[in-house]
Amino acid sequence: ADDKNPLEECFREDDYEEFLEIAKNGLEGWYANLGPMRYPVKPSEEGKHDDIFAYEKFDEIVGGMDKKFWEDDGIHGGKETFCYSPMIQKPYQFQHFSEALTAPVGR
């Protein structure tokens, strides 16, 4: 059984385009697919915990990734829709998360 997490694979392979595709095609809580996984990260500030709980932190990380926002476009009867900027520019947050995921774990 292939139990690989597609989003996790995107981070491991540093594939931002695929990440956006998954995001766009799974609007029903797509980021919840990450589940309760722990990612080792290098501490960015002294004293900070050196790993994060992905499910809790994912919103925060994704928030700065792409121009993701809700809009009332008037066409879908005010239904919330995801909008993405057309420019695929791999942001720092994704790069950092991807690097952190593949970094050797050590204390």
Swiss-Prot record:
The protein's Enzyme Commission number: 1.4.3.2
Temperature dependence: Thermostable between 4 and 25 degrees Celsius. At -20 degrees Celsius, the remaining activity is 20%. Heating at 70 degrees Celsius inactivates the enzyme in 15 minutes.
Principal cellular location given in the protein's record: secreted
Residue positions binding FAD: G35, P36, M37, R38
Post-translational modification: N-glycosylated.
Homology family: Belongs to the flavin monoamine oxidase family. FIG1 subfamily.
Protein name, UniProt field: L-amino-acid oxidase
Origin species: Macrovipera lebetinus
